[in-house]
Regions:
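Sec-dependent N-terminal signal peptides
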Residues: 4-15
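Boundary of Sec targeting at the N-terminus
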Residues: 17-18, 316
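N-terminal catalytic or cofactor-binding beta/alpha core of small enzyme domains
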Residues: 18-290
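Residue-level detector of functionally pivotal "anchor" positions at catalytic/ligand-binding pockets or at interdomain
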Residues: 290-317
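A sequence-level detector of short linear motifs
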Residues: 317-319, 336-337
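Extracellular Ig-like/FN3 beta-sandwich strand-entry sites
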Residues: 321-323
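C-terminal tail/sorting-segment detector
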Residues: 325-342
Length: 342
């Protein structure tokens, strides 16, 4: 005989660190060069190369242009995640400066040179990312940074870089597995318990999920390795903000094929990418990201199953708390991870 356990999910109203940023609202740095849209999901979207501002007092120090379509696609991705989670908000950090005057995917001296305003914008970009990471760590216990770029490689695919280069992806599974602790998803695939090969190139990898929706992607079951093709396997920011060196926030370097981000494809691609991101997070992190005002999740449990204790992510026994990931330990040895959002 079974009984139903009902979990009520309510509209989120989560505080953000000491500043209490409001989910869905924009906050700007000096001169509006950098924008932070606060969120309440364990998802961060980084947009470093979509800006077009070229103030006269900021010198051109980089010979590079905008990742065309990345600004618009990132905003559509943001909107689509809100829609597909029934009102939850991802975090998003945007550089509005043209990357030729400040390139936030490099260390500061290379990125901004000696110009004080450019250097300040660099700090703002990364400080806003750190703010969102701090909030996610406190409220969810883990999360993921997705940095949006564009590529024009002749293979015509979106590239998902997790810190594993083509030299390893082109090799055996055992060779790929040897890179687990050197990847930008180290936390997810060690402490988080996710299968590294699946996260890298399986059907439920981000590339696999996107590829299954008709958008050619690598790595994925269709393209398990780049072979000799073009492939960006990581960037300075995904090393910095992912879990390679520390922390519980993982990172993906998302090199979107530029044609996918063109006007004719942009809406559908963004919608499919958002669904892929949400599926990836739910599958590998075990999250339920749904901000429906009144919705019920039904979980079947055996009638003789008794709750022994509830613990936080550090294993400390704790009473039930909202907006916090908790572990429910039962007398049959099973453990359930849940978060109740209000």
């Amino acid at each position: 005989m079974k009984k139903l356990l009902l979990i009520l999910l309510c509209l989120p109203m989560i505080g953000f660190g000491q500043n209490n940023f409001i989910p869905g609202q924009s906050y700007f740095g000096q001169h509006n060069y950098v924008e932070y849209i606060a969120g309440n999901l364990p998802i961060i979207i980084g947009v470093p190369h979509g800006g077009t501002l070229m103030p006269a007092n900021l010198p051109v120090i980089h010979n590079r242009g905008v990742d065309n379509g990345s600004f618009e696609t990132s905003h559509l991705l943001y909107d689509s995640i809100i829609q597909h989670t029934n009102g939850c908000f991802p975090h998003m950090i945007i550089s509005h400066l043209h990357p030729s005057v400040m390139n936030p995917v490099r260390e500061i001296d290379t990125a901004a040179g000696t110009n004080i305003e450019a250097r300040n914008a660099w700090y703002e970009f990364h400080d806003f990312i750190d703010t969102s990471k701090f909030d996610i760590t406190n409220n969810w216990g883990a999360g993921h940074y997705f940095e949006m770029h564009g590529n024009g490689h002749s293979e015509m695919w979106t590239e998902i870089g997790l810190g594993v280069s083509k030299n390893y992806l082109n090799g055996s599974d055992s060779l790929i597995l040897s890179r687990t602790n050197y990847s930008t998803v180290k936390h997810l695939c060690t402490n988080g318990g996710a299968d590294f090969l699946e996260v890298i190139k399986g059907p439920t990898s981000l590339g696999g999920l996107l590829d299954s929706k008709g958008w050619n992607s690598v790595p994925s079951p269709s393209n398990p390795s780049p072979d000799t093709g073009g492939f960006f396997y990581a960037g300075w920011n995904t090393w910095k903000h992912g879990s390679r060196y520390s922390g519980v926030i993982d990172a993906s370097h998302v090199e979107n094929y530029y044609v996918f981000m063109q006007t004719s494809n942009r809406n559908q691609y963004s919608s499919d990418l958002s669904n892929s991101v949400i599926e990836f997070m739910n599958i590998h992190y075990g999250f339920v990201m749904d901000c429906t005002t009144t919705s019920v999740i039904k979980i079947d449990t055996q009638s003789n199953k008794q709750l022994l204790m509830t613990t936080d992510i550090l294993g400390q026994e704790t009473p039930c708390r909202k907006n916090t990931p908790l572990f429910y330990i039962y007398d049959d040895g099973t453990v359930e991870k849940r978060i109740v959002i209000e």
